[in-house]
Amino acid sequence: MNERRNDIDNARAILIAMVVLGHILNCANPGYSIIPYVLVREFFNAFEMPAFFLLSGMMTDGEKWRRRSTGEYFVRKVKTLVVPYVFFECIAIIYKHFILHTISLTDGLCAMITLHCNVGSDWFLPAMFLACAFYYIYIRFPYKMGWGISCVIFLLMLHFLTPVEGRYWQILLFRGILGFVFMMVGNLLKNQLANLNWKKIGCALFLTAASAAICFKLSLDNSFYSGVLCAPALYLISGTCGASFILGLARRIPWKWLAWIGQNTLVIMGTHQLVLYTIPGNSSPLWVAGVFVLIAAVETAVVYLTNRFCPELIGKKRKEPSYD
């Protein structure tokens, strides 16, 4: 079990690095005019967020939670998702009000409560909570064939669901349902994903790149954030194959520090954009590399401090002191 846990943590570390680099490239290329940056971003977009949900579906122990009460399940999700969301949002409100002077405290609190988020990437936490709520129904009623068919229906439904201005709840629901679909994919394919040789990894990479290229060429947008699903089949392929590619690589990387990064993915997800809100943008590759290093340094400090002084606020348990 420890080996598998490390593999998942390694995969999450690679994925969060892609998320950070993708956001840096967005700042470096706001007009989407620098083609190499656009291509890298499109490739990442094809699978990075689906992969997080897919990995969560792989790791959620249905047998364990069927033996426990509904209350225990949701208390766990509140501790690991809702509490970190509020914590990261409060950090953002304080930072953006007192340091950047870009929002009022009232506007910041309103954005947090209505789930509009003061940090763009914080949308992931409410979406994961909603996806886990849907997933709990599957845990209680584990009929794989029926739920597999239901996921296809959900994808088609999301494809025809057009976001309406002023109806933010619609986008929230979209994210939760789409996240649930990829959690289901992770659960249904966990045995296949447990055995990935180099041939399968290469095939997964090819299918991911091909799907991303088709979507880019035909301007087919698939986005958790925007609540748009123009090509359900391609997004399902790229999300699943991309996650397989990353997971296959992760299983072949023995570095302990990479697993440590993966264990602190939520902290990095919830705070790294504050650095980007602070510094002026630039399109230079040197700037991109420099900002990535800067964020890595800042996040190392943030991760250490949060783990040391307030682990409960980032969804972790406080370690008991050892007197051995």
Residue ranges with predicted function:
Residues 1-324:
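Alpha-helical transmembrane segments and their immediate juxtamembrane cytosolic regions
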